[in-house]
């Protein structure tokens, strides 16, 4: 097991000598395996380890799991940070699903601890099986190449040293090392989509179609990541060729023509429907001076010469650069944006996710952050 993890660390350059690492630990087999492996190799890499544990206050066993994690850390001289979070109440207040709320709370806490101890990395115990489940779930949703990448071994500060380890290998390691991890019984409840995929769909595929489906899905994820990386480089280069003006900071630049109304009233925002192309009211008649904080402008003529597959990626890249996310942007929104550009529709605009306004003016494509 430790050899597999060391190979993964080397392959993806997950850890550097002297790193401070926050390990996300629930007390289950995956996270306890991860913590124990990192504990065993910490001298090899001169690591400083910290544990971040959240008690979601949902299950009766939660308190005993918290105590178990604290005792392990005390025994092995690892500083442990614990957060008590009433996830059910928080989800109710914020009108979110319990799963979503739990994830938000966890990652907020991991980042908080990382900032507090000046950590270089945050280690998450995602496994080969988790990755297979994610790829299959995204595939069924009709995901693009990005969705087929699955769970990446490294993304920013977050590293996943167990991503090439199977769940069977992890449970065997826990037994061999007498870790006595705590099992979350809710993982057996086939209520959530992921649990259904894990407990019902993948075992069925293994039995009836492909006994190596987990390995196959992980191989697909690797290939998708390779292809996505190739496209990413192409898109970055095309963006550099297309961009006329870029201000993604909060410094103000008054560069819009004075007779271009780029303002959007609150009433207009409330009436927008995702994907709709809406008339830009009096775009050539309004004589106002407007200062725009954050925006990107692309060359329309050059954009329209691109292949469709690159156009869609350039649009998403541009929006992500402006907003820091493409959440809420669906396939139909991308199609509408391309249509707006190809037909050079100069008296209409799009607000695809209520956070960005897109329109054409004098041979340019404007992306305005709202």
Protein language model regions, located:
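Non-catalytic, well-ordered alpha-helical scaffold segments
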Residues: 32, 133-134, 195, 199, ...
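Non-catalytic, surface-exposed connector residues within folded enzymatic/regulatory domains
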Residues: 63, 92, 191, 211-214, ...
